[in-house]
């Protein structure tokens, strides 16, 4: 039976197996799809179901394939992490992923540098204001120059600090960017500005003290406190050397007990012969005359001859000292208006064949200042100075410095008790308000670059407390160290306890002088003999500094009270 082509095609379609895995029309050739469409073309319901089933199976297979891939990826990642921990330094590895802090460090340094530049600007403005002074408050040119130098040095240091701050973020590990060498410059310049004073010992002019053993000069010192008496005693030595006499040290019943604070016998050692003797030794030598003063040749004539009143004459006689003749002066000499005298004038007026003479108090004597003010004084000897603290006081001062101060410190003698009226009687006054004094001290601290100040003062706690709060440099309070009250737990003053002189006020006064004389820089009180004796020791010991000065030198107090 002959079948037409259309029947054969239909039979062919019906013979396709149900489990055929080929895709739908998307997988048919283009020409087959064209023929199918031309013959009326839609699929039967059965063929549509078969295609859906095929698509569902394909999707299931895809899901299984994806799940397998996830498992493989997870296993691979686990193996990788395990190998990473086994064969690498994880700390180093993960640290490499940290954020670089360089930018934040640079920003912080820049802010610090800006702040320092602002401080530098304010300091330079302050310096400019300090140099703009008028004639009513004239500051000596040397003071201005010193202050300008110190301020400029300070600003160089600030500039160095700014440089360090800006460079700090760039210093990492062993690598370092080096700043300029201004620190060595400022260090050497700072040392130079407060360097020790050249003593010029080779230019020293002296006289010999070779006394006749039977000729004596009886020392009498009455004005003021211990410092005045020591200055008077030193001048007596000069007179004794000029007059070829042995100097008799006064009795402690008439004057201070000098052997507690100075070593009398050491003076003889320094000259290699007996030039001074104690009052007791004098009485022993002069037994025949019963300690008799043959003649008073008074250096001072006014307000009273020899500056000795009747009460002191009675005290001398009470010691068994007899006095021959009257108290007479060879010239007119007023303590309020001292006249400059020469060595030749003294020898002419005071030369005598009498065995024992006295010239009275010579504290106010103004004689041969160029010789007297030399390091070591006007007399030839082999020591640094003739009058210096005893060995006990000297070692105690050294122990105090080692305990509390160290090598580099400023010493300050701040005289306050009874000083207000004394200073206001002078022109200009030397009594400064505490805030003004603190400003002067702070400037000196900047110049000397010292970390601590030793304070020798008779001021009340209310004044020293205020001063301590106001002495500020670079935003930091500079410590003011005072000698502490006696404490048995502290051993720095054990030598004084051991020798029974721990309760003597004159011993502690000399201890204060000794500590001040050993400082790097000294600030004194103008008009105070305590300060003058410290300056003498510093000059003789070679500790004087180019920065040594009186408090607020060249300035007047910014406020002065009226007279009563």
Swiss-Prot record:
GO cellular component, one term: membrane
Annotated binding of substrate, by residue: 413-415, 529-530
Topology within the bilayer: Single-pass type II membrane protein
Entry keyword annotation includes tRNA processing: no
Keywords: Carbohydrate metabolism, Fucose metabolism, Glycoprotein, Glycosyltransferase, Membrane, Signal-anchor, Transferase, Transmembrane, Transmembrane helix
Residue numbers spanned by region Disordered: 1-28
An individual GO BP term: fucose metabolic process
Pathway as given in its UniProt record: Glycan metabolism
Transmembrane stretches, start-end: 70-90
EC code(s) of this entry: 2.4.1.-
Cell compartments where the protein resides: Membrane
Record PANTHER family: GDP-FUCOSE PROTEIN O-FUCOSYLTRANSFERASE 2 (PTHR13398:SF0)
Protein family: Belongs to the glycosyltransferase GT106 family.
Protein name, as recorded: O-fucosyltransferase 5
UniProt source species: Arabidopsis thaliana
Gene name tied to this protein: OFUT5
